[in-house]
Amino acid sequence: MNTDKHWLDEQATLSLKRLLPRIAARFEGQTDAVEWAAYRDRLTRHFPRLFACLHTLYGDRYDFFYHLESVLCAATELWLARPGELKGLDAMRETDPQWYLSNRMVGAMCYVDLFAGDFEGLRQRISYLAELGITYLHLMPVFKVPAGDNDGGYAVSSYREMNPELGSADQLAELATELRHHGISLVLDFVFNHTSDEHDWARQALSGDPEYQAYYRMYPDRTLPDAFERSMTEVFTEDHPGAFTYVSRLKKWVWTTFHTYQWDLNYENPALFNRMVEEMLGLANMGVEILRLDAVAFLWKRLNTDCQNLPEAHLVIQAFNAVASIAAPAMVLKSEAIVHPDEVSRYISQAECPLSYNPQLMALLWDALATREVRALQRAMQRSFTIPEGCAWVNYVRCHDDIGWAFSDEDISGAGFDAREHRTFLTRFYTGRFAGSFARGAPFQENPATGDARVSGNCASLAGVEQALEQQDESALELAIARVLLIHGVIMTIGGIPLLYLGDEIATLNDYSYDQDPAKLGDSRWLHRAAFDWQRCERRRDMSTVEGRVFQGLLRLIQLRRQNLAFTRAETEILDAGNPHVFAYVRSHDQHTVFVLSNFSEREQRVEARRLRQMGMRKTMVDLYAGRSVTATQELVMVPYQLMVLARVA
């Protein structure tokens, strides 16, 4: 396959010259001249990169140009169907393409049913989100899924039908509009590595239709599955050993990376890619402004590899990006890649995913709390926090999933730890098996033979709030609340978009009742998937309560971020504070600069004045978070778990 850029550009120009008249003849008359001219301009600008991706993936097929024309027709048809308000948003976003880098971006995520019951209930809670300062709302999977096992909504049976318990597709579109009118961008998942085995495509495949069987990866015997598995790593070793499931009705082995009821899609088939383009643009037309791409690492498969992070996976995502840029430029793609940190960063670019979760920062914040040291955190962030211009990390403390220790062995060993032993220590610490631990958590997918495990639990419980309340220890409670605010303070002030897991702002504790539900038994992740307690939330303004102390502290952090232009964009310079317990960085934008210092110890810490000067600080600074002047003649003294956001005195 010819991958020479000059040759591909020439072929793209020639191909568009041939295809554009055919597209125009079919669609131009369905809209006005001004709209069509704008669309044609976007198509002309972004077609070369779409062509390069698709030709590299599928150019050796005899029917390549048929599929190329088909994807352009699908994109154009769905652009024509796009609501006028969203086309207006497209135009606005093209004049401000990096809108998501604003310091006013503050994210939140939730399960609709657990937070508000359904879409209508969520509409009634928009005022709460506005009170908190949220401008980005990620709703966990809302699509139609099988009854019973459905991987928490990630086994999608239809991308166009909603879970009926939440509401209809029309209600979701209405919700998206109302959120947008309140300045909140809707974020949804695009579960595009697999469907459920109850999806219509899977049903058609089960009925024997070869066209739909080609949408998935199916094998008549174990020859190829055995060959693939020799170089692969199992994802869920307990629940689903291997990566294939025998389907007796088909008499075939189906590729099922995650669970037996989740069938992996076959992106080697361009017809499948085109169908998924239609599903993606359908979500865009519902009002989705940020699309989370689920399990990006697993999209492509090749023998004698681990079938993760392959170059073709990046090309598939880049092709989706190009299509969105043509037909729905208001929508931005976000990657979910829980893989080695070096691999995570490879998904991040304006041509692929401008946004990406930062699982390494999350894991290392918890590491720093457990060890009381920032050596690993500082080393890893100095090495890998910088990403391409125009892109941003989505930084979070907790989410719907477990905590995996997603940092590199190199960074941990460089900080003086044995990587394997250190992961074991962290798991023991956060599951309460380590003497002196403040945490209340539970292991997830624990392997007794190797000791490998991930950790479940709510932020407040993991940070010590639950234990302190149990022991009625006010001093321990004060430290625990300080931990919660400290790590949220980092995600609010470091480069990128901060993302709250709703419930953490009122210090929601672990829900141990999940194991009484047979459908949840054995999955400790339900420990941190409790229904939002609106009765506790009523105490959020009462500073004598835990809920009030955490909520008001977080609100101050959010307001600090939104009021200071230094937190615009994503650039962050990680500094060395000269103290192994203090994490330091500087944020700058135009004439605005702030220095952020975080004490990850329950002891008082000092930073030498000489080191402060080396980092660019002056003798007298203003702590924007505390709202007071700070003078450091000889040294700066930080109280336990203190966050300082220092600006020069004007």
Predicted regions and their residues:
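Active-site and adjacent substrate-binding regions of carbohydrate-active enzymes
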Residues: 2-650
